[in-house]
A protein has these predicted regions:
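Short, structured active-site-proximal loop/turn typified by the sulfatase FGly-forming signature C/S-X-P-X-R
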Residues: 42-91, 148-152
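Secreted, luminal/periplasmic, and some membrane-associated catalytic domains
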Residues: 49, 75, 97-124, 132, ...
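Conserved small/polar residues in nucleotide/adenosyl-binding loops
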Residues: 479-485
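Second-shell loop/turn segments in exported
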Residues: 38-44, 69, 121-126, 245-250, ...
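Mature N-terminal segment immediately following signal peptide/propeptide cleavage
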Residues: 23-42
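His/Asp/Glu-rich, glycine-adjacent segments
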Residues: 87-88, 93-274, 283-290, 407-413, ...
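Bacterial Sec-dependent N-terminal signal peptides
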Residues: 1-25
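Structural recognition of the beta-strand scaffold that forms the well-ordered cores
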Residues: 30-33, 64-66, 82-84, 148-153, ...
Length: 486
């Protein structure tokens, strides 16, 4: 990830030096992060695209292929925090959307902060758990606070980590009301966003929204689909989840564009010679987080609509600011939602792994070895947290207990490797440990990290979604676009 962002800085400097003797800063930097964008799909579906979206980026921009996040356990929160901070979870602290708070033994959200109230939401959130500065913060410092920073995203974590600590505002969609939301952390909610909520928000329009394929069925041939009928969704059919379904559809990208256009029309962003930042997040995942097997046609249509959303965004930027005054970068979050387990019919290796059962058996093993006590305090997201106070009371060596626990966990079916915190922090370097170490934060991660074999399903018996482990990664195409002044 550091290499990716270093490339961005090099391009900015090199482009400016070639153009003139003194580097000209852009009026507006637009960061477009596309959640769950897959490079293989992006290229496979290219015959369905127009000339003004992805193809324009490819022709007129500069593309960096095969970029890879250098840490494990990527999700939306950790990816966007890495993009905008330029460093890994081991430094920025955002190891995932949720992690276990060792002091309370309860999962916490990466954005939770009860010190701040919400606008158009009952969420109390802020970017305070992000431990490093971001592009937005550094822009504010460089411009002595004069550069404007707005972040617009379907989801709260994406907006907050893109806006950083010093941004002017972060906006995300309330999944219960469809209104654009914000936090008092950034001060007053902008008047133009309130006006949009009161007059044009999707709650006024969603009843009439229907999603059908743009093209005839015969054009969606890139993924196997066994259905004979075209899909048709009315978001309003499921009244209790209509906004959640909308947020997990390609229509949300047009809503992001709509609020971005409001900012360009009614604020001063991009209007003077002081560089501003507009950080946007799109969605390119499966509809309503279904598997590809369930919605092959939908995912192809999603990329068609995504291409058109990008074309619309470029047109708005050209009209309002002039693309010659804009630097745009486009990248992906580098992960995808978990897919369905492989069918046993095809004899693909796999099975089910239960972290809660694994933690219970580990506690029994430690009791048999060291005497009565609750040695395992908690477990979460393939990590196990040990009871440090009990170990201190019994005068047991933490590193030794971690190592013995890791060796015990290695005996479980489905476990590829178990890493102790001591090994991750102080052990010798290997390519595997390097990526896990980069995703590990000593104050937020567990004592033990379990690497489950590919093809196995991590079953959550306490509620929540199950997860199928895949060890392949989706390369992150990074695109930079600047257009020369005519």
């Amino acid at each position: 990830m550091k290499g990716l962002l270093t490339s961005l800085i090099t391009v900015l400097t090199f482009t400016g030096l070639q153009a003139q003797s003194l580097p000209a800063a852009p009026k507006l930097v637009v960061g477009l992060t596309i959640d769950q964008l897959r490079t293989d799909y992006l290229e496979a579906f290219s015959s369905l695209y127009g000339e003004k979206g992805f193809k324009r980026l490819w022709k007129e921009g500069r593309v960096f292929h095969n970029a890879e996040y250098t840490f494990c356990g990527i999700d939306r929160a950790s990816a966007i925090a890495a993009i905008y901070s330029g460093t890994t979870p081991s430094m920025n602290g955002i190891i995932s959307q949720r992690w276990m708070d060792a002091s309370t033994l309860r999962p916490v959200n990466s954005t939770d902060d009860t010190a701040f109230m919400g606008y158009y939401t009952d969420q109390t959130v802020a970017p305070t758990k992000l431990l490093t500065s971001t592009i937005a913060d550094e822009l504010k410092i460089a411009t002595q606070g004069k550069g404007l920073v707005y972040a617009i995203a379907p989801d709260c974590d994406a907006a907050l980590f893109a806006a950083g600590h010093a941004g002017n505002a972060a906006f995300w969609l309330n999944p219960n009301t469809g209104k654009w939301s914000g936090t008092t952390y950034y001060g007053e909610f902008p008047w133009w966003a309130s006006q949009y909520n009161d007059r044009q928000a999707i709650d006024f329009r969603i009843a009439g929204m229907t999603w059908e394929p743009i093209f005839p069925r015969g054009m969606y041939t890139f993924l196997p689909d066994w259905r004979d009928m075209l899909f048709k969704y009315k978001f309003d059919d499921d009244r209790s989840n209509k906004y959640r379904r909308f947020i997990a559809s390609p229509f949300v990208n047009d809503e992001v564009n709509a609020l971005a256009e409001e900012a360009l029309n009614k604020s001063s962003i991009g209007m003077d010679d002081i560089t501003d930042l507009l950080a946007l997040t799109y969605y390119a995942g499966n509809y309503a987080h279904k598997s590809v097997q369930e919605c092959a046609m939908e995912i192809q249509d999603t990329y068609v609509r995504l291409d058109r959303s990008i074309a619309d965004l470029l047109e708005v930027l050209d009209k309002k600011v002039g693309l010659q005054n804009v630097l745009i970068f486009v990248t992906s979050t580098g992960y995808i939602d978990s897919e369905s387990p492989d069918s046993g019919l095809y004899k693909v290796p796999g099975g089910e792994f239960y972290l809660n059962r694994c933690a219970a058996l580990l506690n029994m093993y430690l009791m048999a070895t060291y005497g009565e006590g609750k040695y395992v305090e908690a477990h979460h997201n393939q990590q196990i947290y040990l009871n440090h106070k009990l170990l201190e009371k019994k005068e047991l060596n933490l590193a030794e207990i971690q190592q013995k626990s890791a060796e015990f966990l290695m005996q479980f079916s489905g476990v590829n490797e178990a890493y102790s915190a001591n090994r991750l922090l102080l052990g010798s370097w290997t390519p595997e440990i390097y990526k896990i170490r980069n995703g590990y934060h000593r104050k937020r991660s567990g004592d033990l990290v379990i690497d489950v074999l590919p093809g196995w399903t991590i079953v959550n018996e306490n509620g929540g979604d199950n997860k199928v482990v895949r060890h392949s990664y989706i390369p992150v195409s990074y695109t930079h676009l600047t257009l020369p002044t005519n």
